[in-house]
């Protein structure tokens, strides 16, 4: 049985947690994988709603504007989780510093980065910052870019796959009924 650990950015929104959890639950339910999930802040509130228990809580010094810091309490917790759980694959969404830290500590560990197209190409962001983020994300063994637009590998990534937006199973199971009501779903930065 494959063991998969998911580490999903828990703020400022839920987009990275929702898609990551959906992917892990599909791997568990459809392919028999054993899964563990780490998130924080709003991400943990979502996991609680989904029935997950015994969630690790961050302290303010555990994270910054670009995500988790690998050198504080939660960073140590992630390393301990990897040593105890011994995952075959770690799927990380929105945590560039964690990808780098895990590749330093566990160079043979297979890491998959879930990314938005704007994580790879974004003219609105400072381009020096984009080069930094791409350097961190490209340390992964596989980058899965999911969104409304396709991106190509500029040669920095070991393997990059660009796919349409990952849809939750609940959305695919919706029954369509004709009504005069209009509904709008908001979310996501891209």
Briefly describe each language-model feature range.
Residues 38, 58, 112-117, 146, ...:
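Generic beta-sheet signal
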Residues 79-95:
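Short N-terminal targeting/anchoring amphipathic segment
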């Amino acid at each position: 049985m494959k063991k998969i650990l998911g580490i999903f950015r828990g703020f400022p929104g839920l987009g990275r947690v929702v898609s990551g959890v959906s992917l892990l639950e599909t791997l568990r339910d459809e392919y028999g994988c054993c899964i563990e999930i780490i998130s924080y802040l709003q991400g943990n509130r979502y996991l609680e709603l989904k029935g997950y228990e015994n969630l690790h809580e961050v302290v303010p010094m555990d994270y910054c504007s670009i995500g988790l810091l690998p050198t504080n309490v939660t960073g140590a917790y992630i390393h301990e989780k990897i040593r105890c759980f011994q995952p075959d694959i770690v799927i990380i969404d929105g945590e560039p510093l964690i990808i780098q830290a895990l590749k330093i500590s566990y160079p043979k560990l297979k890491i998959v980065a879930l990314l938005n197209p704007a994580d790879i190409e974004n003219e609105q962001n400072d381009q020096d910052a984009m080069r930094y983020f791409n350097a961190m994300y490209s340390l992964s063994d596989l980058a899965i870019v999911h969104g409304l637009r396709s991106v190509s590998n500029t040669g920095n990534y070991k393997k990059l796959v660009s796919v349409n937006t990952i849809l939750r199973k609940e959305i695919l199971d919706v029954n369509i009924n004709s009504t005069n009501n209009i509904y709008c779903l908001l979310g996501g930065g891209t």
